[in-house]
Design a protein with these regions (language model features):
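Class I S-adenosyl-L-methionine
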Residues: 1-129
Length: 129
């Protein structure tokens, strides 16, 4: 089991990378900051939204965790995301749960690669696997 709680920015990716490398039976992460993708991504059709810093940051949170989920699925994990606590307690309330199946998901990895290219990012998770 690999577990991380409020690991800031790429520290979550480090934990996930450790889990993937060791073929951990389960990975449970509660991400915190999402600065890595925030600094990288751009997508012209969203420029009217992303010119507002707060909206760009919230979209970066979603993109980061969505990419993480797709990558984990591609590497053989069944992934679920849940709100583990009320958003009134903390807005950083997403828990990523991944259970190792051993069956790599080619479609998820293709979608991951496609989204990466579309938004011009190099997610940190790849550096830690």
């Amino acid at each position: 089991l690999v577990l991380s709680l409020h690991a800031c920015d790429t520290a979550t990716d480090m934990a996930m990378g450790l889990g993937i490398r060791s073929k951990a039976k389960a990975i449970v992460c509660v991400p915190c900051c999402h600065k890595d993708i925030l600094k990288q991504y751009s997508y012209d059709p969203f420029r009217m939204i992303t010119r507002h810093g707060i909206l760009k940051a919230r979209l970066a949170d979603t993109l980061t965790d969505g990419l993480r989920a797709a990558y984990l699925e591609g590497m053989g994990y069944k992934v679920s995301m849940i709100e583990y606590i009320s958003p009134l307690e903390t807005p950083k309330n997403i828990m990523i749960r991944a259970v190792y199946t051993g069956k790599k998901n080619k479609k998820s990895m293709e979608e991951y690669e496609e989204l990466k290219k579309m938004i011009h990012v190099n997610p940190a998770i790849e550096r830690f696997v």
